[in-house]
Amino acid sequence: EYIHGEEKGDIAAIEKKIELLEKKDGEEGAGERSLKEKFTGAVIVGDSITEGFTEYDILNTSSVVAKIGVHLDELDEQIKQVKKLSPGIIFLSLGMNDVEHTNGDADEFVKQYGAVVDELKKSVPGAHIFVNAIFPVQEKAVKEKPVFAEIENFNEKLKELCDKTRTAFIDSSDLT
């Protein structure tokens, strides 16, 4: 009798109830999942900052491809490793070492970063790639290495590259 009554009911109202229940289920489940679970199928490629995700047991080693001090023109092995993992999502957290390595040349930096993005798109064609902005540094670091004053300019160029290559850009400058 209940089923027959519902069959005659407003379909839009029933769909709305289902949608609300699914949303509630999603919210409840999302809070219980660890970062390790949330990053299953994703990989972060980066340098020493990225390596901290495994050092401090935040993410599984299968979600992190990192090397301390790595430069954009030295990523062949990391790209091979990412290809083997074949993730659906790739986060790139690179560039801090390259601000100094390129002597503050943002155009050279973008050229090298673009080559990395292109190679990853070829190596893992179905993956969604997200490029993280270079984190800003404290004024103390700028005084020690004035080239770090160019980070904002590097990030602007990086965003332009992402727009041009249709790659997602994550501006993390407000997080620090």
Where are these regions (language model features)?
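Charged helix-capping and loop-helix junction motifs
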Residues: A106-V116, V147-F154
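N-terminal secretory targeting modules
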Residues: E1-F39, E55
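Conserved SGNH/GDSL esterase-like catalytic core that processes O-acyl groups on lipids
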Residues: G26-G114
